[in-house]
Structures are given as C-alpha cells and as structure tokens.
C-alpha cells in the first residue's frame, strides 16, 4: 500500500494499523514517526473538518508541504446554520494592509479551498517564529498570487507556539490555520493506541484566515461536534 496515495472522500479505518504493521521494523525511527503523524493528521482533518482529496506528498523536494487537500466548507456551514444564526456579514472585511471578500460570499457547492499542510511531529519543542516564517515562505512559493484568497495554509503539531511563533502566526499576511493534533501513543506492550490517541485537540485561525472564513462556522462545528452527526448520514 502506498502511503502517498490520494484519500478521496474518506480515510479507511485500518490505514494506520496497516502502516504500523508494514513498518514495524523501523518503529523507533524518525521517518516512521513522521509518516505516522502525517497519516494521523490526514485522518483527523478528513474526519473532523471533512477535507477531501488528501495526499501525503512530503519528501526531499516537497517545498515545505507535507500534505495537500481540498476543503468544501459548505456542508459544514449548512449543518451549523441549522443550529446557529450568524450576524449579517459585510461584503468585504478589512485586514491591516488590504481587504478581502469572505469565502462565505463566494462559496458554491463545487467550490473548494486548496489546502497546504505542514506537519511538525514534535515531542516537546514548541513551534518557533523561524518555523512560521518558513511556512509563510512555502505558501508564497506554492500558491500563485491570484489564488491566495482561495487557499489555506495549515500547520499541524502536537505542541503549541512560542511567544514569537504565535505573534508571527497571527500577523501573517496569508490565511493560516493551526491544528493541534496529538501523536499516536505507544502503550507499555509496544503496541500503538490508534483508536484513543492522535486526536484533533485544538483549531485556531490567524486574523487573515478568520476574516476569510468568517461565518463559515468552523469553530462552532468543532465545538458542537457536528462531524459526528454528518458521519452518521
């Protein structure tokens, strides 16, 4: 099984177990841990945020991008609007150096946000300002200027930011989302707790992303665990 294949609309439940079984001999290596974390992030973003067409692309020449995907937020927004009424949204929202048209005013059933994901499988280190700057550079290299407002840069890490890191993240002139996804835990018997660990714990948008995704209801969707009801349909 190729771990760099495209996961179209769902993440097979046995993917992580298959990866672990196929790579048991290198389970203590950083390569194993890195790929396991990338697959864990794919699982959580597909199951909780309903991203689609996700592909692990990380490698020597990945340009700082580990995973690519597409995000149709419309089903999430429609589901959450059945429970929450949002205030009227202006046609454009101001940012420090520009203004943007919120995605809510542009979204259509077949319109997707392009997502670029970078994973930091840290055990204890926090995300620094230098790493945020590198992430901004990766976005600038990968995304043409004309697509900057229809693309999202996502950083996933099991740890949070340093003070400098969160400041630069918030001030970045690109739409950025941070998802805190825990790593899969290894049990005392050497097995991996795929079912109960490796979960999405935190979702955070910088100022640019919060304006772009205004009234889409993503944070409300997660708080109310909307993904549980949608998964049952």
UniProtKB/Swiss-Prot annotation:
<dbReference type="InterPro" id="IPR018828">
    <property type="entry name" value="RRG7"/>
</dbReference>
<protein>
    <recommendedName>
        <fullName>Required for respiratory growth protein 7, mitochondrial</fullName>
    </recommendedName>
</protein>
<dbReference type="Pfam" id="PF10356">
    <property type="entry name" value="RRG7"/>
</dbReference>
<dbReference type="GO" id="GO:0005739">
    <property type="term" value="C:mitochondrion"/>
</dbReference>
<dbReference type="InterPro" id="IPR011856">
    <property type="entry name" value="tRNA_endonuc-like_dom_sf"/>
</dbReference>
<keyword id="KW-0496">Mitochondrion</keyword>
<dbReference type="GO" id="GO:0003676">
    <property type="term" value="F:nucleic acid binding"/>
</dbReference>
<comment type="similarity">
    <text>Belongs to the RRG7 family.</text>
</comment>
